[in-house]
């Protein structure tokens, strides 16, 4: 029973946001010179997230710094959005990015790997996922702390495989 309760609480936390104070929408909505310069060659993503998730904002900042443009949506039912996109609960994290082509990027996937994926999408791919919220992944930086993690290739048949193993912070950039 305790194990079930812990699982439910973990999933609830991941799907409803990180519990941090609301932050500004995104620098994508600002008039800063850097945002204007990056927009001309930017790859657009729609990012679904809780309005109170600070680590989601940090991931968006990471993506924008690497030439992506984020349009932010705050749906009231994140689990429904994820299910509609074909993301199984075991791959869940706190936010979901969707490319113009319809590929999904679940969680704290490094921009480098999103770009690599979009440049050469594997056959039958749904997208990439970093389940949960690994410490040290883009948007989850905590000083010098870093936990190695896998980036998963999600397939349209519901299966997954390892797309990349991230063993060091440097491999993310």
For every predicted segment, state its role.
Residues 1-6:
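Bacterial N-terminal signal peptides that target proteins for export
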Residues 18-22:
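Bacterial signal peptide processing site
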Residues 27-42:
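A short beta-strand-turn-helix
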Residues 38-60, 99:
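Local sequence-structure signature of Cys/Sec-based thiol-disulfide redox active-site neighborhoods
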Residues 52, 59, 74-77, 110-114:
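Stable alpha-helical elements in mature extracytoplasmic
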Residues 84, 90-173:
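Thiol/selenol-based redox catalytic cores and closely related redox-interacting motifs
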């Amino acid at each position: 029973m305790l194990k079930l309760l812990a699982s439910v609480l973990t999933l609830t936390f991941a799907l409803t946001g990180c519990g941090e104070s609301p932050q500004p929408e995104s620098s994508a909505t600002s008039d800063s010179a850097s945002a204007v310069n990056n927009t001309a060659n930017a790859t657009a993503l729609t990012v679904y997230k809780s309005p109170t998730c600070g680590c989601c904002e940090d991931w968006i900042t990471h993506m924008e710094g690497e030439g992506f443009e984020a349009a932010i949506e705050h749906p009231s039912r994140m689990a429904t959005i994820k299910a509609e996109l074909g993301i199984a609960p075991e791959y869940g994290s706190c936010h979901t990015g969707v490319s113009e082509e319809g590929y999904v990027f679940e969680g704290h996937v490094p921009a480098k790997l999103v770009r690599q994926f979009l440049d050469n999408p594997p056959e039958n791919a749904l997208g990439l996922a970093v389940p949960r919220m690994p410490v040290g992944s883009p948007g989850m930086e905590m000083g010098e702390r870093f936990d190695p993690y896998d980036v998963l290739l999600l397939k349209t048949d519901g299966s997954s495989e390892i797309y990349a193993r991230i063993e060091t912070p440097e491999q993310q950039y």
